[in-house]
Amino acid sequence: MSLSLWQQCLARLQDELPATEFSMWIRPLQAELSDNTLALYAPNRFVLDWVRDKYLNNINGLLNTFCGADAPQLRFEVGTKPVTQTLKTPVHNVVAPTQTTTAQPQRVAPAARSGWDNVPAPAEPTYRSNVNVKHTFDNFVEGKSNQLARAAARQVADNPGGAYNPLFLYGGTGLGKTHLLHAVGNGIMARKPNAKVVYMHSERFVQDMVKALQNNAIEEFKRYYRSVDALLIDDIQFFANKERSQEEFFHTFNALLEGNQQIILTSDRYPKEINGVEDRLKSRFGWGLTVAIEPPELETRVAILMKKADENDIRLPGEVAFFIAKRLRSNVRELEGALNRVIANANFTGRAITIDFVREALRDLLALQEKLVTIDNIQKTVAEYYKIKIADLLSKRRSRSVARPRQMAMALAKELTNYSLPEIGDAFGGRDHTTVLHACRKIEQLREESHDIKEDFSNLIRTLSS
């Protein structure tokens, strides 16, 4: 019996689990087999508890399959083992459209510096942290749409410079990417108060570089950015077509990774889809972990509204929160803005917050949403997206090239409009409500199983809500 047993388990787990789950939870594990005991080492307690809770039965089942009565006992521990005694899971890209994987060059961290065991006291130059102390993991509302992103960010905060470096978060505007950046920064500094953590928008990096060139201070610029312990850059897509900035960031990126210094980047799109950015940079963006943040589902939208109201000492009836969440679906920022308007109107008028009051306070916003998202608009958008005719969506054709877009359009109609299932079915060629319900459940299932369907749904939501 040897560590090849764990390799067999890894191969099977990679086949059985979604790519995101495998990369996030199984990949960081290290294994040691001795005395008929397989010890699995997790980088921190968070990963250990999650793996033991979610995947213990899977792993034990595989051990029994491969070894039968001779299956080793399983033991979990927090920590790492020497390289000669460990076996790490190979790196795989996650949450990515189907694509050809670019091999990642081997990176060997310098032995002299871990970057995190001994963080020095602040020294010149003075670092501008810019981390907003108000954005923490505690006040980030978690749901299915952002669960993986939050979990990855939490792990980076607990173990910066580790397995998820760089961490790349992508998704539409107002979905919580910036909140998570600040939460990681706050988490790192809570753990290491003297850590040099710098948050910035990508345009600030460009501005700093331009000033450095103008003032003949490019070496100081390089020293500043290459000596931080964690660099958190928002909206990296603004590097597009800025060749000199991309060149400098390329070398900064390499220097930070070689020093085991953490990099977190955000964008409104998947790395490979960022136009105007060099391929060598886009390739590096995907070296660590890439995770999507999607528009919040109904339950999460309600939870966001209730939490925001609670923070403002406002009693928000559940039916009112549901009413708002059902009608405003695109992003968190829009939800919070609408609630702020409701609260302000209630304070000015002294009236109770009811559904009728909300209808009045948000009448222009609600009217705009209802005007923008109609079943006709959904059918037109879906037909264009899948390059079929609207008539195909209404027809009786059952080929997958038509049936799947039809199901997608029905699911979007249920998500984005207030029409009943029978009304939606009637708009799709006179189908009954059970057909619509089946379509909605099918798309929900496929969003869990297929990255392509998940991406299609998110792209269409963004298009229809913009």
UniProtKB/Swiss-Prot annotation:
Give the residue ranges for region: Domain III, AAA+ region: 130-346
Q: What PROSITE patterns does its record include?
A: DNAA (PS01008)
Record keywords: ATP-binding, Cytoplasm, DNA replication, DNA-binding, Lipid-binding, Nucleotide-binding
Q: Got a GO cellular component term for this one?
A: plasma membrane
Keyword ATP-binding attached: yes
Biological process terms in GO annotation: DNA replication initiation; regulation of DNA replication
Question: What's the superkingdom here?
Answer: Bacteria
Q: Does this entry carry the keyword Nucleotide-binding?
A: yes
Principal place of residence: cytoplasm
Residues that bind ATP: G174, G176, K177, T178
Molecular functions per Gene Ontology: ATP binding; ATP hydrolysis activity; DNA replication origin binding; lipid binding
Ranges where the record places region Domain II:
86-129
Region (Domain IV, binds dsDNA), start-end ranges: 347-466
Q: Which SMART domains match?
A: AAA, Bac_DnaA_C
- Region (Domain I, interacts with DnaA modulators): which ranges? 1-86
Compartments, record wording: Cytoplasm
Checking Pfam families in the record gives: Bac_DnaA, Bac_DnaA_C, DnaA_N
User: Which family, according to the similarity comment?
Assistant: Belongs to the DnaA family.
According to its record, what is known about the domains? Domain I is involved in oligomerization and binding regulators, domain II is flexibile and of varying length in different bacteria, domain III forms the AAA+ region, while domain IV binds dsDNA.
How is the subunit organization of this protein annotated in UniProt?
A: Oligomerizes as a right-handed, spiral filament on DNA at oriC.
Described purpose of this protein according to its UniProt entry:
Plays an essential role in the initiation and regulation of chromosomal replication. ATP-DnaA binds to the origin of replication (oriC) to initiate formation of the DNA replication initiation complex once per cell cycle. Binds the DnaA box (a 9 base pair repeat at the origin) and separates the double-stranded (ds)DNA. Forms a right-handed helical filament on oriC DNA; dsDNA binds to the exterior of the filament while single-stranded (ss)DNA is stabiized in the filament's interior.
Q: What is this protein called?
A: Chromosomal replication initiator protein DnaA
Species of provenance: Salmonella choleraesuis (strain SC-B67)
